[in-house]
Amino acid sequence: MIIMRNYKFKLESLHQNQKVFRRCTVHSTVLHIISLHEDWSTRLTYKLSLYYCKIKNCYTTFKFEKSNRSIITRAERIINVQHLRRCKDIVDNFSGLISILLVLIFCINLSGCNTSKRLAYDNKYSYKELSKDDPHNLTYIGHYKVGKNYKIKGKIYKPYTPKYFTETGYASWYGGRKDGFHGKKTANGDRFNRNLLTAAHKTLPLPCLVKVTNKANNKSVILMVNDRGPFKKNRIIDVSQKAAEILAFKNQGITKVRIEYLPNETEKFLKKINLKKTENKIFANNYKESLFTKVTKNNQCSINCHIKLVNLKYKLAVNP
């Protein structure tokens, strides 16, 4: 029970992010309702509506930053001569109102104590959920590689690390049940998994992050390049089966795309998975033995989870 001056409010319901307080008086026609709207990505917004005999006399909006400090951003009174004085007395009693709202915040904090760890970019997912496709893939088994020039079908390819890179052309996907790629080693020693957000490119460093956009429907996804290919005419990138599902071209097989190399996100990603940029494979393996015997910094987040985190950062879908 919460008391504000001579007004008593009782908590009636607590579900679907709404807290409703009703005034406990002899006159049941007089209601005071406080509704709560939660926006976890920005702030908590509280709206207080005061009703007198089914007439809306006062409307006040409270906004709370994550620091839980109250900021009254709007106080609007609808003029009604008969109830103006009574309305003003209640609305101006900010200390009482703030006390009520602080109790609401306390309820929210209690409800959040037992929830699993949530992501900064999207409260919908947990690390465990994002790691469901590779829950044991907590250490990166591949090595960093740019590689030397190589020749395939009479054509020479020159791998390099660009500062800026975009390319437009056709994408295909691999990892179907009949093509035999699932579970095979990639060009940098990683293990290909058709359910992860990965791709193959002819010249980009391995691994690196690229943004792939389907020109037909403008759907985008950020992928980790960990293999070489494709080597068919007019194909610029091969994506995993999961990526093809997200980009919505699995059934048609190929689609026109635009790819963009993300150097800054790649640097951050390499640090998160504890992978040092070196062309020396032996050194990379030694480095792996000393560091990768321990799980990554967040022992609940797999390699694919880290890729999904980058997607969520840019508000991109991580599921079809």
Swiss-Prot record:
<dbReference type="GO" id="GO:0008932">
    <property type="term" value="F:lytic endotransglycosylase activity"/>
</dbReference>
<dbReference type="InterPro" id="IPR012997">
    <property type="entry name" value="RplA"/>
</dbReference>
<dbReference type="InterPro" id="IPR022438">
    <property type="entry name" value="RPE5"/>
</dbReference>
<protein>
    <recommendedName>
        <fullName>Endolytic peptidoglycan transglycosylase RlpA</fullName>
        <ecNumber>4.2.2.-</ecNumber>
    </recommendedName>
</protein>
<comment type="function">
    <text>Lytic transglycosylase with a strong preference for naked glycan strands that lack stem peptides.</text>
</comment>
<dbReference type="InterPro" id="IPR034718">
    <property type="entry name" value="RlpA"/>
</dbReference>
<dbReference type="InterPro" id="IPR009009">
    <property type="entry name" value="RlpA-like_DPBB"/>
</dbReference>
<dbReference type="InterPro" id="IPR036908">
    <property type="entry name" value="RlpA-like_sf"/>
</dbReference>
<comment type="similarity">
    <text>Belongs to the RlpA family.</text>
</comment>
<dbReference type="GO" id="GO:0071555">
    <property type="term" value="P:cell wall organization"/>
</dbReference>
<dbReference type="Pfam" id="PF03330">
    <property type="entry name" value="DPBB_1"/>
</dbReference>
<dbReference type="GO" id="GO:0000270">
    <property type="term" value="P:peptidoglycan metabolic process"/>
</dbReference>
<keyword id="KW-0456">Lyase</keyword>
<keyword id="KW-0961">Cell wall biogenesis/degradation</keyword>
